[in-house]
Amino acid sequence: MTGSKLKSSIAELLEKVRLGAFYMSRYPRQLSGGEKQRIAVARAFAARPDIILCDEVTSALDVSVQAAVLDLLQKLKEELGTTYVFVSHDLAVVKAISDRVAVLYQGRLCEIGPSKDVYQFPSHPYTEVLIGAVLEPDPDIKPKLVAEDIVEEKPPEIGCSFQGRCPRIIGDKCRNET
């Protein structure tokens, strides 16, 4: 693609991400954090992919800009049928954007399932710890395990990575199965 077709395609992408064609002549130093993120989204969609990997896409943005970017991603997902693999440490963001969630601990999969199920009925203790660290706790309920209790150490060669700190360890099952 060259010349006027290229410019037209870029202008269309900029409109999709709620920026005007006049952004084509701007330098990065002239853009806010949210505008830079929208440009990154436009670039990701330029090749019209079926799947986009979003790695910490909202991590450096303030809450209002995060909401705008998530709203944009949701709109584009519905409009273009794109699938996202969304990597984030921010569980509120994950909950807002995801249909399915996979929880990793020390690089190993602990839990995977529909977002609603994972958040309402976590089946792995580490998932419970993560959710408990974000949601408002009930002051009358003492958590069995809190995020501060988790000390990073080398994961075991086999079995669940969380077995050394888990309050619900199931003997050989947790020691031998992932």
Spell out what each predicted region is.
Residues 5-22, 131:
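Conserved ABC ATPase "signature" region
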Residues 27, 56-57:
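Walker B catalytic motif
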Residues 27-31, 35:
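Conserved ABC ATPase signature
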Residues 41, 53, 69:
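Hydrophobic anchor residue at the start of the ABC signature
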Residues 46-50:
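A short, proline-enriched helix->beta-strand linker immediately N-terminal to the Walker B motif
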Residues 57, 61, 65-140:
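P-loop NTP-binding/switch modules centered on Walker-like glycine-rich loops
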Residues 114-178:
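Short catalytic/signature loops enriched in Gly
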